Amino acid sequence: MNKIRILVCHLLYSIGCPLNRDQLIEITSLEQAVNYFDLMEALDGITGRLCTCQEVNGIPVYSNTRLGDAAAREFGSELPQSIREKMFEEAVKVYTRDE
C-alpha cells in the first residue's frame, strides 16, 4: 500500500498539476499496474496529509501538499524507473487529452 501512496504522490509531483480520481484510475490501471480497490484505499490514506482532495464541479481532484511533494522527492526513487516513466507518460497523455 505504501508503494501505491508513493506512486500517487510521485505522479502528482512529476506532472505538476492536480489530477482527478478518474484520471488517477486510468493512469494507474495501465497494464494493470495498480488494483482499483488498492488505489482507493491509498487515496483515502494520503488525503489530508500527503495530498489534498477538493471537489471541482463535483469531481474529486487531488494535489500534493508540501509533505506529499517531499515524499515524492525522497521516496520516488524506490519505485522502479520503468514504472515511474510509464506512469508519467500515461499521466501526460491523460492530462493533455482532458484539458
What are these regions (language model features)?
Residues I6-H10, E26, D44:
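Contiguous, well-ordered alpha-helical segments that form the cores/surfaces of helical PPI scaffolds
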Residues T47-N57:
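A short, conserved structural fragment
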Residues P18-T28:
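Short acidic, hydrophobic short linear motifs in intrinsically disordered regions
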Residues M1-I15:
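Short alpha-helical segments that sit at the start of domains
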Residues Y13-N20, V34:
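Short capping segments at the starts of secondary-structure elements
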Residues A33-G48:
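Short amphipathic alpha-helical interaction segments
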Residues R66-D98:
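Short, amphipathic alpha-helical interaction segments positioned at domain boundaries
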Residues G58-T65:
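Minor-groove-contacting beta-hairpin "wing" of winged helix-turn-helix DNA-binding domains
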